Regions:
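Bacterial Sec-dependent N-terminal signal peptides
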Residues: 2-5, 15-40
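Low-complexity, glycine/proline/serine-enriched flexible coil segments
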Residues: 11-12
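First exposed extracellular module after export/assembly in secreted or surface-exposed proteins
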Residues: 31-134
Length: 134
């Protein structure tokens, strides 16, 4: 009787392991990543009025066809803003091209002054756009 119970217990444990190992994981989480994207061009005005919103067109490179705009990280120090564009890579099978994508960056200041926007290209190398707010 003891041997039969032990065999049933082993079968039960292996059944649980087998069933839980077959649970499908979310496909979208498996092939999703983010990476810093080098900015190649900034287009937009260089002057603005106080509280005027400017739209700057930012061009950046993705490293394969799955790359799209992800988000922007800003670090503000005085009148200088350092901006990092992050590309979002969603998909397991991607073309091996190196596309240039664009996004809008909104700029608005409540005080007059000269503002420097530094967009990351490569580590410690920036593309700078200066805006004078009057």
């Amino acid at each position: 009787m003891n041997r039969k119970f032990f065999n049933n217990l082993i079968c039960f444990v292996f059944s649980i392991i087998l069933l839980t190992s077959c649970i499908k994981k979310k496909e979208e989480d498996k092939c999703l990543s983010y990476a810093k994207a080098p900015v190649t061009k900034i287009e937009g005005a260089t002057t603005a009025s106080v509280n005027q919103e400017l739209n700057l067109t930012i061009s950046f490179i993705c490293f394969n066809g799955c790359g799209q705009f992800g988000n922007v990280e800003e670090t503000i120090s005085g009148n200088t803003t350092t901006i990092v564009v992050n590309a979002k890579y969603a998909g397991c099978i991607c073309t091996q091209d190196v596309p240039t994508r664009t996004t809008l960056y909104k700029f608005k200041k409540s005080q007059a002054g000269t503002y420097e926007l530094k967009f990351l290209q490569t580590e410690n190398n920036y593309l700078t756009h200066t805006i004078i707010v009057q």
